[in-house]
Design a protein with these regions (language model features):
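Short loop/turn motifs at secondary-structure junctions
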Residues: 43, 109-111, 278
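Non-catalytic accessory segments adjacent to catalytic cores
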Residues: 92-138
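Short catalytic-loop micro-motif centered on adjacent basic/acidic residues
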Residues: 112-114, 177, 281-285
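Conserved acyl-donor/pantetheine-binding loop and adjacent beta-alpha core of acyl/acetyltransferases
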Residues: 63-83
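Aromatic (often tryptophan-rich) hydrophobic motifs at membrane interfaces
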Residues: 48-59, 79, 87-103, 210-322
Length: 344
């Protein structure tokens, strides 16, 4: 078994490998790899484990540059899950890839390397040489239960609070549909910026919204679900599809309509649609440990809690003396280390 880099020679074999296991996700895909390169102008260094001429494991990673140095992330951009992709729990494959990842960061003279594990991965017991550790709560709903056979009582699979929210949206005549046109994305962007301003949250860059339409295939790779009250758009939800999993990516809502719960109906209809198309899982993404309200909301959708981790190796101790503002400015979409580890 040897370690290699994913190049054009291996692209089709890599895509075939991802299809072999139901737990590979959107962030592992070739399409997302190319998307990150265009969006962030980063270098891709996807590691693959090859045995007998066949890919048996992978670890997606990209190299990010700032004025003060470089970092290696698996993966960057709002906590995109990377980590080891392997479907049989082969400890040798895992160890080869993880060691290769941290050695790559060292050889590239990075400030640090950060590997974000996938909540779907069943990690064998490994020796991981890291300096800092961060944790998130992954939450995943099994949506296979949402089929036409249960059309009369399918919302009963969810918590009482979620059922009330869905019924409230219906009672208020909220209508939902898929709209992948430019004007729908303009609404998504504007509402996303308003929502983030309200909570002082980090915004997706403007280029992101244009690039999604240009780079991915609508209906196959993504859908933008829209909710209307009469003729007015009041909520939207961007989701991505890959293999057996749907990624809950950008939810937005016009705040004066929050009380009638249009987003809950959007989520429900998008889940049903994905289930009918053969998808198994709805990945809510990571939740910080200090976000109990967000955690409870997802839990009411029958989501299972699966913790996952950020494994960070620091190569240059000067990093600990940098300010949080400097790191955020130079690496806006990368993760170098937990800020509570800084000396400043």
């Amino acid at each position: 078994m040897k370690l290699d880099l994913l190049t054009s020679k291996w692209e089709s074999a890599y895509e075939k490998f991802l299809e072999e296991g139901e737990t590979s996700i959107f962030y592992h895909s070739n399409a997302f790899r190319r998307f990150l390169k265009r969006l962030l102008s980063v270098e891709d260094h996807y590691l693959i484990a090859v045995e007998g001429g066949k890919i048996v494991g992978a670890l997606p990673a990209v190299l990010c540059r700032g004025k003060v140095g470089k970092c290696l992330n698996s993966l960057p951009f709002f906590g995109s899950n990377g980590g080891v992709v392997e479907f049989e729990g082969n400890k040798k494959v895992w160890q080869l890839l993880i060691n290769g990842f941290f050695e790559l960061g060292k050889s590239k003279e990075c400030l640090s390397s950060n590997m974000i594990s996938s909540p779907f991965a069943e990690n064998p017991e490994l020796d991981i040489d890291y300096d800092c550790l961060d944790k998130r709560i992954g939450q995943i709903s099994d949506i296979r239960i949402l089929t036409d056979k249960d059309s009369n009582n399918e919302i009963d699979h969810f918590g009482a609070f979620t059922r009330r929210m869905i019924r409230k949206a219906r009672k208020n005549s909220i209508e939902v549909k898929v709209e992948n046109e430019k004007n729908a994305f303009e609404f998504l962007k504007a509402c996303h910026y308003e929502n983030m301003d309200d909570i002082n949250g980090k915004k997706k860059p403007e280029f992101f919204f244009h690039l999604v339409m240009d780079h991915f295939n609508e209906g196959k790779d993504y859908n933008l679900w829209m909710a209307y009250k009469g003729s007015r758009p009041v909520a939207a939800l961007l989701i991505f599809y890959f293999n057996r999993t749907v990624e809950y990516y950008i939810p937005v809502i016009v705040k004066e309509y929050r009380s009638i719960q249009p987003l809950s109906l959007l989520i429900y209809e998008a889940m049903k649609d994905a289930s009918k198309k053969g998808y198994y899982y709805w990945n809510w993404g990571g939740t910080h440990l200090d976000q109990p309200g967000v955690h409870r909301f997802k839990k009411q959708w029958n989501a299972v809690n699966i913790p996952y981790y950020y494994y960070i190796k620091v190569y240059d101790n000067h990093l600990f003396s940098y300010s949080e503002d400097l790191i955020r400015r130079e690496f806006p979409y990368c993760y170098l280390l937990p800020f509570n580890e800084l000396n400043t």
